[in-house]
Amino acid sequence: MEPRSEPEPQEQTILEYLKQQLSFRKGEREVPSSGSTGGQAAEPSQPFPWLSAGALVLAFLAQLLLEPSTNRSGILSIILYIFALGLLLAGGRRKEWSLDLAHPSPQGWRIFTDTTWLILPGIGFATLSFFMLSHGFFTLPAAFVWTAGVVLVILGLWEHDTEAQVESEPLKPSFLTQFQQDRIWVISAGLVILIVFYFAISRLDLVPPELISGQVDHFYTVQEILHGKTGLMFNRNLVSEPLQYYWAAFVATLAGGKVSFTLLKTAYALAGLVGTFYIYRLTKELIDRWAGLIAASLFGVAFWPILQTRAVLGAGLTLPILIPAVYYLLRGLRRDGENDILISALLGGLGVLTNKVFLIFPLVVLVVLLIWLYHSKENSKVSVFFSIIALFLLVGAVTAVPILRAFTLNPQEYLRPILSRVSSLETPLPGNPLGLFFNNLLAALGLVNWSNRSSWVDGIPLRPAVDWLTGALFILGLVIVILQYRRNI
């Protein structure tokens, strides 16, 4: 008589995964049944996380009430948020949820390699390109020398001893094998990819009834690049940094060399998919792949990220560069990965070529490094801390040589957008500077959930900067991170 085949284990659905993450107690995991001849053992049922679910519902309702309306009032939303946070805290006490971050095994730092000497010729090439760009325009020889300098510096710091960093991994199965083994994951990932791609490219052909001057300048700048005007900065634009215009010109060249408003949105929509992919990788690095898939799906259909790719006002490449830079920074610190830190520094330098908002990125890196050093239990990490700072400064400066040269040629024009907002350069300050600072700080704290303080071009006036779903999850997620941090210190 042939032996009876055991029943195949049931695959986990996304709904079951969410319920499991919310209901499992910290440290508990599901114990698979032994599959004895008597059938599968009964699995212990987990109580539904009613308190956490109630917090989610109240937070969604609170944020919905902050949508633009004639009688919008924040009082009721604040009350609902207070109740939501109370339920969230109660759910945490009942162990309905816990933020269990993944903890990879660090391999040990090795900042300097056998090819470190390449840094010297790399700095030499970067310095030479600085003087070759003295006319304020990119030329083919100058671009080649600058690129060579960046490549040599990266190669000089790149860790080639992969055996010391990467454990041997088994060969990845073919797509068919992976589909047979984990079809729920493959189907879910494919569905998310299709939905995100649809939201990214849907209705790109629509044009606003009236273009503003910033959008028109953006259009003509890309057109000028295609006709040979390869400037280091484009001062007439809302954002003068050049990288986004060159990206749009590159896409236009691939499309036949004709510029249109639809083509500009398409170029930045394609770049936006990179940001969505790295949202998945970042969340997967911190938690797991299912959480990463959920995060990518929410980010890919969210109002604010899509708006950045369609407004054509200078932020089209900001998120596609910023998110990978943060990912590689955190991954490098968690895994002692020098190469990840290098990539983050490279992206930070490219970010300075993209938008002035990246001028704050060095401060973000410093804060992250200080927190990492504070929680480190090894005295040797102090030397690593200063080595990473030096690495960021070197790679970032070499990568940002074109914008540094543009700054030295015309510092007033580069600083004008910044100084006009923090001083009386263009108009007198309407009040006490300290009072204005705190008023602006309070307004900035309310951008996500109360009012974006923007025009119709880059948002819906008097509406929160993000959609109601993102706004509610932002508040709950922020509280969860703070609570989990307090538990871990």
Residues of each region from the PLM?
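Start-transfer (signal-anchor) and selected internal transmembrane alpha helices
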Residues: E6-T13, A42-L56, L80-F199, Y374, ...
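Membrane-interface transmembrane helices that cradle and orient dolichyl/undecaprenyl
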Residues: W109-R110, L155-E159, A325-I343, G351
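Hydrophobic core segments of transmembrane alpha-helices in multi-pass, intramembrane catalytic enzymes
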Residues: W146, G272-G275, F299, G314-V326, ...
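Short helix- or helix-capping micro-motifs
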Residues: V196, A295-G300, G348, V352
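Transmembrane-lumen/periplasm boundary regions of multi-pass, lipid-linked membrane glycan transferases
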Residues: F199, L204-L232, S240-P242, Y246, ...
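Juxtamembrane segments of multi-pass membrane glycosylation machinery
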Residues: W247-L270, W304, N452-W456
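Transmembrane-helix motifs of polytopic, lipid-linked glycan transferases
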Residues: T262, T266-L286, P324, I475-V479
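Short acidic/glycine- and proline-prone juxtamembrane loop motifs at membrane-interface regions
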Residues: K265-Y268, W304-L317, K356-V357
